[in-house]
Amino acid sequence: MKFIVKPHPEIFVKSESVRKRFTKILECNIRNIVKSRTESVAVFNRRDHIEVTSESDEFHAEVLEILTHTPGIRHVLEVKQTEFKDLHDIYEQVLELSGSLIEGKTFAVRAKRRGKHDFTSIELERYVGGGLNQAVESARVKLSKPDVTINVEVTNDRLNQVLASHKGLGGFPLGTQEDVLSLISGGFDSGVSSYLHIKRGSKVHYCFFNLGGPAHEIGVKQVSHYLWNKYGSSAKVRFISVDFEPVVAEILEKVDDGQMGVILKRMFMRAAGMIAQKMKIEALVTGEALGQVSSQTLTNLRHIDNVTDTLILRPLINWDKEDIVNLAREIGTEDFAKTMPEYCGVISKKPTVKAVKGKLEAEEQKFDFSILEQVVQDARMTDIRDIAKESKQAAPEVEQVQAVEEHAIVLDIRSPEEEDDNSLEIDGVEVKHIPFYKLGTQFGDLDQAKTYLLYCDRGVMSRLQALYLQEQGFNNVKVYRP
């Protein structure tokens, strides 16, 4: 197994020292993730590309998944590497591997060369292409928009034939930019805005203002853990949970109805700014888009920004909702967001779309700011890697079993894609497939006289979902870990 990783082109327009630093960070990021999930896979930095190799194909799918979801990579090439003697030997090897692919089709050969050879890249393309054209009678050379492009790379005495090319995330390697604190609610917008900053190279820490109790927090932790695990697991990041119910209660009791929405957002920014200052983070990230809701007009956003000196980044400010949802679907957060409750919208019945500074300040004079200071002081900070462990500690009553008891039903809560790749079948046991993101709405329709064992590959999502269901009053759930 061998992959050639091509860094994002923006890295190579940097100065020599910056380019070296960025590619070194990318190399370390890849190595850290690969080491944590596989065995006997080596990572090498080759100046303008990174090689990931192994003597076996055991972890092929896992490594490809890692590389195509790691920021800073333009594309990933799967290659077959062999030694060669001369130009004709290269042609024969290419014919053996690719001859059948060009039958009845147009083709072109694209070659790259590094090292000292007695032929140029153009001569290599002409020799191999001409040979293939003669050897495969039904094939025809076409240099512009061919049906098949055969990519060949020669490095010193090694021939790399490209078997497949996979698109990477692009962006910058994680850790090349400064850390940010994302205000995450679990909805479409905050998940996408967090992803965009991960992709751009920032370590994204997550700040959650809890308005909906334990069930809401569990859902947001799932989204945050998913984003970190899928796109940023080379970084150590924090999840901060702030119990904002006392602040909401104070607003509901003392603040004029029309000003509630903007003042709540101002309280969010004040609290997040305090937390960012403690963590020595220079910027906050939100999923706000211009005009999407009443608090997101230009006037209101300006009033919201003015309560903190911390920079507020809004990567989605000019995005349409449809585009946000489409990207959420692409990155895998849509299903979380669809089942996530929305609490902020119920705060104000007649929200102002053009707040006045004097009115806001007058209403905030009624507010007891010691409550805000206290909830920030009581904020819980968790290493995001410990979310799985925390779910065990938070719900010790969630029983974990290795064998299926009589009459119990196993619920496979993996995504449809995971279930299709490796379906769960147990002799003599009924197995139902309900994706985790539909469990909250469909579990109540099941026969509650039965016991249900939740199953996922690693046991993390099953524990979190079991905790969620128990918070909803269902006590007939356990975690299945065969």
From Swiss-Prot:
Subcellular location: Cytoplasm
Keywords associated with the record: ATP-binding, Cytoplasm, Disulfide bond, Nucleotide-binding, Redox-active center, RNA-binding, Thiamine biosynthesis, Transferase, tRNA-binding
Predominant subcellular localization, coarse grouping: cytoplasm
Pfam families xref list: Rhodanese, ThiI, ThiI_fer, THUMP
Reactions catalysed, as given in the entry: [ThiI sulfur-carrier protein]-S-sulfanyl-L-cysteine + a uridine in tRNA + 2 reduced [2Fe-2S]-[ferredoxin] + ATP + H(+) = [ThiI sulfur-carrier protein]-L-cysteine + a 4-thiouridine in tRNA + 2 oxidized [2Fe-2S]-[ferredoxin] + AMP + diphosphate; [ThiS sulfur-carrier protein]-C-terminal Gly-Gly-AMP + S-sulfanyl-L-cysteinyl-[cysteine desulfurase] + AH2 = [ThiS sulfur-carrier protein]-C-terminal-Gly-aminoethanethioate + L-cysteinyl-[cysteine desulfurase] + A + AMP + 2 H(+)
Residue sites binding ATP per the record: L183, I184, K265, G287, Q296
Domain THUMP: start-end pairs: 61-165
Active site: C456
InterPro entries named in the record: Rhodanese-like_dom (IPR001763), Rhodanese-like_dom_sf (IPR036873), Rossmann-like_a/b/a_fold (IPR014729), ThiI_AANH (IPR020536), ThiI_fer (IPR054173), ThiI_N (IPR049961), THII_Thiazole_biosynth_dom (IPR026340), THUMP_dom (IPR004114)
Function (record text): Catalyzes the ATP-dependent transfer of a sulfur to tRNA to produce 4-thiouridine in position 8 of tRNAs, which functions as a near-UV photosensor. Also catalyzes the transfer of sulfur to the sulfur carrier protein ThiS, forming ThiS-thiocarboxylate. This is a step in the synthesis of thiazole, in the thiamine biosynthesis pathway. The sulfur is donated as persulfide by IscS.
Protein name: tRNA sulfurtransferase
Native source species: Vibrio campbellii (strain ATCC BAA-1116)
